[in-house]
Regions:
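Ribokinase/PfkB-type carbohydrate-kinase core domain
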Residues: 1-115
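Conserved phosphate-binding/catalytic region of the ribokinase-like
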Residues: 83-169
Length: 169
């Protein structure tokens, strides 16, 4: 992946102020702001980060200490492998680790327990944007103060709506 014009992108103080005026900052592996996350965390603004499937990427390791909600996509590991991975990620800083598993649903680890949720059955037209929609629904639940299971349910519902039509991205 080549960043193009984003390779030289840097947040200004005005950008940081704008981001921190919101209830939550959401970014991802391609957002190129991982070196600035500490400035957001210093202001006690929660950070959600979409690491996609980049489990061992250098950005992943740099960002984790400043992330509250760490999202990963992984549908090729056993439950035992996922649990081990999620415990390891949680130990690096995030408050909650969320893994979407495609048609196998999702799993969340909050440091105390693993919570699993399946999918919302629907007709799949185009899976593009399913993960982003899950993240949006999950985080909406967080902002509404919902328990983890309900956040997962909101994420799955949002995802099911997105994959029901072509060109969601």
């Amino acid at each position: 992946y080549e960043e193009g014009v984003m390779a030289d992108f840097k947040l200004t103080e005005e950008d940081i102020n704008f981001l921190c005026s919101h209830a939550l900052v959401v970014t991802g592996i391609w957002g190129t702001i991982e070196s600035e996350l500490h400035r957001i965390k210093e202001r006690n603004v929660p950070v959600a980060f979409d690491f996609a499937d980049k489990i061992n990427h250098e950005i992943t390791h740099r960002a984790l200490p400043y992330v509250d909600y760490a999202f990963f996509s992984c549908d090729n590991k056993s439950d035992k492998e996922l649990h081990k991975f999620m415990i390891s990620i949680k130990s690096k800083g995030p408050k909650v680790v969320i893994v979407t598993k495609g048609e196998k649903g999702s799993i969340v680890y909050d440091g105390n327990e693993f919570t699993e949720f399946g999918i919302v059955e629907c007709e799949v037209i185009d899976s593009m944007g399913a993960g982003d929609s899950y993240i949006a629904g999950f985080l909406m639940g967080i902002l509404e103060g919902k328990p983890i299971f309900e956040c997962m349910q909101k994420g799955a519902l949002s995802s099911s709506e997105t994959i029901g039509y072509y060109g969601a991205w």
